[in-house]
């Protein structure tokens, strides 16, 4: 009953406000339904050729805005199908929900523009959130393209006041060994990618993670054994490569995605200790059956400590990937360790022909080592069903409502905007 009540309240909130809280890490703006209609609200971020097939697709599809107009005679603000060099701004209140935050009240905003007529859409997305668990988050995410798409500038700034529990090291850790922590956190990531050929980009950047005022309420545990600190700084350079052939970054129907990041943290740049890591993110999207709107999505995410000894909060951890989407079925931070190996599959299918409702079933598996130099431990599964509600039929953006299950009785509701991967 509690789950049903939470879900009902959240869906009502999504329909009456702009659900941008979960979208903040997707690096792309989406159509919003302002509480008060605003001029020039952004309708989509995906440029679709104005062909007969595209027009027919639009005519046959229904999204949340169409339903609001049909049932409540609510007409969203005038929108446009393309983004020009003139920036488009949207600032709206929203609500969000995750296992680690519970309910959150959010003020979200985004800006979208093109540097040139043929350039990809550049975006700046931000939000300020206050959560039921007394957390404060302020992220600013930017994805800027040059006029000729030769360069891509990617920024990730975050300021958090973040009470959160840890459960020990390795994927053998016990959910009942919860250790409540509290800390403040600043992240500054700046990366520049240059076009190499086709869909391939490569480059580098500067990365810093700064944790301070770290406290915990646990007894003698893995955190104490690993080494408690009141602060930690990881500062260094990164080398990056990106290959992206997806037909739609928000809701891919075909294509693939591969990203590699090598990170080297150096003492002379202020790091608490020298260490390096490697992240390999690979995804594949397959129409199944071919020619349908159903998709089999596959994902592999490996986060590996190559050498050195990262501070406890800098170790790979569940849902601390770039978009906080690994490990549905578990709370953020449930598993932590020097090595993380993760895989997930999700089958996405249409329920109604008009595209308003769809469904998914997902299955994931993750394995962690404990401290550096130890072996990978047990494989922990996560699985569950999900519902998709079409928020924007042009960009194919969905409201994603999933219920995940994991080991040791772990379970919970997961709500996002835009597909998980």
Task: Annotate each predicted stretch with a short phrase.
Residues 248-352, 357:
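C-terminal outer-membrane beta-barrel translocator/porin domains of Gram-negative envelope proteins
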Residues 171-176, 219-225, 276-278, 312-321, ...:
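Flexible, surface-exposed loop regions and adjacent strand-edge segments
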Residues 112-116, 129-135, 160-164, 209-213, ...:
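Sequence/structural signature of outer-membrane beta-barrel proteins
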Residues 81-91, 95-233, 238, 334, ...:
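Gram-negative/organellar outer-membrane beta-barrel architecture
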Residues 26-28, 44-71, 75-77, 164-295, ...:
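Transmembrane beta-strand segments of outer-membrane beta-barrel domains in Gram-negative
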Residues 1-65:
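Cleavable N-terminal export/targeting peptides
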Residues 78-87, 115-121, 147-152, 198-199, ...:
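Short loop/turn motifs that connect adjacent beta-strands in outer-membrane beta-barrel proteins
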Residues 348-382:
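C-terminal hydrophobic structural anchor segments
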């Amino acid at each position: 009953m509690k789950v049903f009540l939470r879900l009902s309240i959240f869906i009502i909130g999504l329909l009456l406000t702009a659900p941008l809280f979960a979208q903040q890490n997707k690096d792309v703006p989406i159509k919003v339904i302002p509480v008060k209609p605003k001029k020039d609200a952004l309708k989509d971020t995906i440029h679709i050729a104005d062909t007969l097939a595209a027009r027919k697709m639009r005519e046959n599809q229904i999204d949340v805005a169409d339903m609001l107009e049909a049932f409540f005679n609510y007409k969203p603000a005038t929108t446009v199908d393309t983004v020009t060099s003139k920036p488009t701004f949207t600032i709206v209140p929203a609500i969000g929900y995750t296992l680690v935050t519970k309910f959150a009240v959010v003020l979200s905003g985004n800006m979208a523009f093109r540097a040139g007529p043929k350039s990809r859409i550049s975006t700046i997305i931000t939000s300020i959130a206050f959560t039921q668990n007394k957390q404060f988050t302020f992220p600013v995410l930017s994805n800027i393209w040059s006029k000729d798409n030769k360069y891509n500038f990617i920024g990730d700034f975050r300021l958090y006041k973040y009470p959160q529990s840890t459960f020990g090291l390795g994927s053998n850790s016990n959910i009942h060994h919860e250790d409540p922590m509290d800390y403040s956190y600043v992240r500054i990531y700046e990366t520049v990618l240059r076009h190499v050929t086709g869909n391939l980009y490569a480059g580098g950047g500067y990365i810093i993670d700064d944790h301070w005022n770290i406290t915990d309420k646990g007894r003698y545990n893995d955190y104490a054994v690993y080494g408690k600190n009141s602060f930690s700084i990881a500062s260094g350079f990164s080398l990056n490569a990106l290959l992206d052939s997806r037909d739609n970054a928000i809701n891919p129907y075909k294509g693939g995605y591969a990203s590699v990041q090598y990170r080297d943290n150096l003492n002379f740049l202020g790091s608490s200790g020298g260490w390096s890591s490697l992240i390999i993110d690979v995804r594949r999207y397959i129409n199944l059956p071919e020619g349908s709107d159903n998709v089999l999505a596959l994902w592999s995410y490996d986060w590996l400590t190559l050498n050195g000894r990262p501070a406890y909060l800098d170790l790979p951890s569940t849902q601390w990937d770039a978009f906080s989407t690994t490990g549905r079925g578990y709370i953020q931070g449930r598993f932590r360790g020097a090595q993380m190996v993760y895989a997930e599959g999700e089958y996405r299918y249409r329920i109604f022909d008009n595209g308003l409702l769809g469904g998914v079933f997902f299955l994931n598996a993750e394995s962690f080592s404990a401290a550096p130099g130890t072996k990978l431990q047990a494989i922990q599964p996560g699985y569950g069903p999900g519902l998709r509600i079409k928020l924007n039929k042009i960009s194919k953006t969905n409201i994603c409502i999933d219920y995940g299950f994991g080991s040791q009785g772990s379970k919970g509701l997961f709500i996002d905007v835009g597909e998980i991967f």
